[in-house]
Amino acid sequence: ARYESGAAMARHDADLEIDYAAGIPDSGVGHAIGYANQKVVPYKRPFVKYTPTWPRSFMPQNQKMRDLVAKMKLLPNEKLTYGKRVVFMDDSIVRGTQLKDNIVKLHDTGIKAIHMRLACPPLIFPCRFLNFSTSRSTYDLYARRIIRDMEGVDNLTDETCMKYVNPDGEKHKEMVEIMRKHLPLTSLKFHRLDDL
């Protein structure tokens, strides 16, 4: 399923010129292999994963601890990134903590272009059955915070958030562009439900 997900995203990037595809360890690896195979480009591993940390960087409740875990968890290899144009794949953006930190580290290595591909649509609605953290704030979700800022209100309704779900809609495109600039990335795309 992850290979097929990556391959589907690669079909939307037919004209994108890159040097290779890479997965954000470990959740993006399968997607990136599928992407690389479909696009017929090399798959490389430009990150070394330091495993004696939390299993998921978004799990600690304290933001300072999340930042520390994200900073320590993945280390880029400059020999594989300097001057390169790379598609990175991951499964999702939850809080955005780890992704933002990794992008800063990649820019510090002299990477030429970072094209981020996420294997699920933006997480706009929380799921109470997923026990990622004890927090119940919907604003822990990166996409939800972006929508809140775009709408300029503190109390988002589901009806308002639904305006951002359609990947062909203007609100969705504007949200993704704000995310792209904020992170900062060369390009940012999310998997579409109609490709699943």
Regions found by a protein language model. Give the residues of each.
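PRPP-associated nucleotide enzymes
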Residues: A1-L196
